[in-house]
């Protein structure tokens, strides 16, 4: 399992940051988790029996869900904008 490349990570941070040098806002954290989740999803199509990494994937999905719940309670407009931008819900 490889982490998100540094250049790709900085692109995601720049795209979802609310201010300069913003790496901790829920939007940035959710976006980074989403990129890692998408990469792992591709990995599991080829390696169906990799249960150890699947546990890590489930932890990431759970953490993303918690961050989204926090953002939804804090600011519903930001939540909806993030969901739409990432394409997470239908």
UniProtKB/Swiss-Prot annotation:
<keyword id="KW-0687">Ribonucleoprotein</keyword>
<dbReference type="GO" id="GO:0003735">
    <property type="term" value="F:structural constituent of ribosome"/>
</dbReference>
<dbReference type="GO" id="GO:0006412">
    <property type="term" value="P:translation"/>
</dbReference>
<keyword id="KW-0689">Ribosomal protein</keyword>
<dbReference type="Pfam" id="PF00312">
    <property type="entry name" value="Ribosomal_S15"/>
</dbReference>
<comment type="function">
    <text>One of the primary rRNA binding proteins, it binds directly to 16S rRNA where it helps nucleate assembly of the platform of the 30S subunit by binding and bridging several RNA helices of the 16S rRNA.</text>
</comment>
<dbReference type="InterPro" id="IPR009068">
    <property type="entry name" value="uS15_NS1_RNA-bd_sf"/>
</dbReference>
<dbReference type="GO" id="GO:0022627">
    <property type="term" value="C:cytosolic small ribosomal subunit"/>
</dbReference>
<dbReference type="InterPro" id="IPR000589">
    <property type="entry name" value="Ribosomal_uS15"/>
</dbReference>
<comment type="similarity">
    <text>Belongs to the universal ribosomal protein uS15 family.</text>
</comment>
<protein>
    <recommendedName>
        <fullName>Small ribosomal subunit protein uS15</fullName>
    </recommendedName>
</protein>
<dbReference type="GO" id="GO:0019843">
    <property type="term" value="F:rRNA binding"/>
</dbReference>
<dbReference type="InterPro" id="IPR005290">
    <property type="entry name" value="Ribosomal_uS15_bac-type"/>
</dbReference>
<keyword id="KW-0694">RNA-binding</keyword>
<comment type="subunit">
    <text>Part of the 30S ribosomal subunit. Forms a bridge to the 50S subunit in the 70S ribosome, contacting the 23S rRNA.</text>
</comment>
<keyword id="KW-0699">rRNA-binding</keyword>
<comment type="function">
    <text>Forms an intersubunit bridge (bridge B4) with the 23S rRNA of the 50S subunit in the ribosome.</text>
</comment>
